[in-house]
């Protein structure tokens, strides 16, 4: 009869945290400058107009505006932020 307990699988029993990658702001959404648009590994989606790229390939808005996803050639995508229409921002004068 054994007098020691079995230790089991000591090399198992851990898991890494999820990286929470993906699109954070979708097409048609209004964003402010500095908002993160996409968290990604590598340039799966490329930066377009008014979009910056961080050192970890995160794409973020450089201006306030509306997010749009576009094609870049045949097999690539890009994300751009276009400014809001100037007429929508100005108050309407009462007569």
Curated annotation (Swiss-Prot):
CC per GO annotation: cytosolic large ribosomal subunit
Keyword set includes Ribosomal protein: yes
Superkingdom of this protein's organism: Bacteria
Recorded GO MF terms: structural constituent of ribosome
UniProt-annotated stretches for the region Disordered: 1-25
SUPFAM superfamilies the UniProt entry points to: Ribosomal L27 protein-like
InterPro entries per UniProt: Ribosomal_bL27, Ribosomal_bL27_CS
Bias (Polar residues): 7-19
Listed GO biological process terms: translation
Family the UniProt entry places it in: Belongs to the bacterial ribosomal protein bL27 family.
Annotated protein name in UniProt: Large ribosomal subunit protein bL27
Organism, as annotated: Gloeobacter violaceus (strain ATCC 29082 / PCC 7421)
